[in-house]
Amino acid sequence: MMEVDLLYFEKKYHNCIVAGIDEAGRGPLAGPVVASAVIIDNANIITGIKDSKKLSKKTRELLYEQITSNYVWATAIISHTEIDDINILEATKKACSIAVANLSLEPEIVLVDGNMQFKDERFVSIINGDNLSLSIAAASIVAKVTRDRLMLDLSAELPQYLWHKNSGYGTKEHIEAINIHGLSPYHRRSFRCC
């Protein structure tokens, strides 16, 4: 298999300030959606960064600390209630836009994982971007760790839903817990699950 150059898109826009953005939490039945934006420093490449889903929890946590200590980054969180109000796609797009707006450095190009379309012309959608862009991969790590930590806190409040294990996703055990205990205040009412 051919090695992917994770800096291809960053090099393509080498004269620009480039941010990568990714989200965590589009599919779960409970909790917020989180988007993170990261501007990497091409002179200080952190090794091991790749799509958060391909990393162990321990490695994600270590890389999160390195990314947030060395790069410009920002995160936005959209609550489960707002997801229900505006739908998950619009909530995700809103989180992405807020995360970019919260960066301390204004990007000229924003690489976005997936195929979402934005009115802001700086946004460039890249399907499978978390496997093709180092900036997006770094953002995927920050978003996932941030959301997992939020769900861990919620799990301490409502342990019966096992969010410390499932992060709010519709696992068999989570759906069984909903059937036994009903929906919690943190479940998305617009997601029909059981």
From Swiss-Prot:
Cited InterPro entries: RNase_HII (IPR022898), RNase_HII/HIII (IPR001352), RNase_HII/HIII_dom (IPR024567), RNaseH-like_sf (IPR012337), RNaseH_sf (IPR036397)
Q: Which GO terms describe its molecular function?
A: manganese ion binding; RNA binding; RNA-DNA hybrid ribonuclease activity
Would you tell me the Gene Ontology cellular component terms? cytoplasm; ribonuclease H2 complex
This protein's UniProt keywords: Cytoplasm, Endonuclease, Hydrolase, Manganese, Metal-binding, Nuclease
Query: Which pairs of Cys residues are joined through disulfide bonds in the record?
Result: none
Per the record, the domain of life is Bacteria
Under Enzyme Commission nomenclature, its number is: 3.1.26.4
Q: Where along this sequence does the record place binding of a divalent metal cation?
A: 22-23, 113
A Pfam family it matches: RNase_HII
Q: Which reaction does it catalyse?
A: Endonucleolytic cleavage to 5'-phosphomonoester
Magnesium among keywords: no
The record's Gene Ontology biological-process terms are: DNA replication, removal of RNA primer; mismatch repair
Q: Report the locations given in the UniProt record.
A: Cytoplasm
What remark does the entry make about the cofactor?
Answer: Manganese or magnesium. Binds 1 divalent metal ion per monomer in the absence of substrate. May bind a second metal ion after substrate binding.
Where does the record place the RNase H type-2 domain? 16-194
Main subcellular localisation: cytoplasm
Q: Which HAMAP family match?
A: RNase_HII_B (MF_00052_B)
Q: What does this protein do?
A: Endonuclease that specifically degrades the RNA of RNA-DNA hybrids.
Q: Give the protein family.
A: Belongs to the RNase HII family.
Protein name, per record: Ribonuclease HII
Annotated organism of origin: Rickettsia massiliae (strain Mtu5)
Read off the lineage from the record: Bacteria, Pseudomonadati, Pseudomonadota, Alphaproteobacteria, Rickettsiales
Q: Which gene specifies this protein's sequence?
A: rnhB
